[in-house]
Amino acid sequence: MADFEGLFPAIITPMSRDTGKLNEAAFREVMEFNIQAGVHGFWVAGGTGESVLLDDDENMRIAEIAADQSRGRIKNIMHVGAATTERAIALAENAARAGVEAICCVPPFFYRQTDEAIVEHYRAVAAAADLPLFVYNLPQSTGVEITPELMQKIQDAVPQLKGLKHSAPSFPNVREFAHMGLDCFIGSSLLMLPALTIGAIGCVDGPPNFAPELWLEIWDAYNAGDIKRAEVAQDRASEATMLVREFGLHATAKVILSERLGIDCGDPRAPGRPLSKEKQAIVLRRAEELGLTRVAVAQGDD
């Protein structure tokens, strides 16, 4: 297996229902559940992890926990994106100290920047960590699309650049990024199989958090050359993604994981809203219909 490929769930950040702060024990449980299911790595403190709602201490602690809990069994790609270069550098330096395998970063957002400013931002952040860098292409949230043309400028200036998570609607660009020699994760779990066929090296998204087995089946079938089985697996996995689209990612993922693992992952951080009791019941019934039932997570290996 290459350094980075396969299924990398964008992991949630469980919150304490009492304090609203990071629930470290639940975070470790969610990691361990996914590791034992067979995932290849994690995308940590990204959009699914409510990154822009975390303070610096929480972000830094999450990096430490991720590295400690994985203990080299999988690879962690830690999100260090921020609106300012100074803050992103500080988060990148901490990620490197924590011992994660790579960093990822959205472009600077809110204020529109020139291509030159974006390139310099990535150069400075990557140099601070000196780890493999994955660009986080999420224009729906950042207002900035990393086009192949802009990516070429970043590639020319940033020696640490490894690849990207491509969550933009421009699906054909996956092929262009692959032709550039970049490791391109598709950022939509609905498109894992078609993306693999045009050069993606895996999938990073939120729904695999609570149902890693569904997307691992796609990965295994595709790599075995069994496209029909992969198509069936993609259809089944997509039902879980559509559940998230109907009820909201953060609340839905936390409800299902809480039920499957027998823990409390809390609610989305405000202004995010929890699901009503009625909606929780619908989500859990639909999850059970997909076979997403209670699992036992063994103690992680020392």
Features from the language model and the residues they span:
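A general structural signal for well-ordered alpha-helical segments in protein cores
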Residues: 27, 59, 63, 88, ...
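Active-site beta->alpha loop and helix N-cap motifs at the rims of alpha/beta catalytic domains
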Residues: 2-143, 153, 297
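Short helix-capping segments at alpha-helix termini
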Residues: 68-74, 98-99, 129-131, 156-160, ...
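C-terminal alpha-helical cap/extension of soluble enzyme domains
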Residues: 3-14, 37-39, 197-200, 204, ...
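Short, charged helix-to-loop "capping" segments that act as catalytic/coupling loops
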Residues: 15-24, 156-161, 258-264
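Catalytic alpha/beta core domains of metabolic enzymes, predominantly
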Residues: 126-128, 139-247
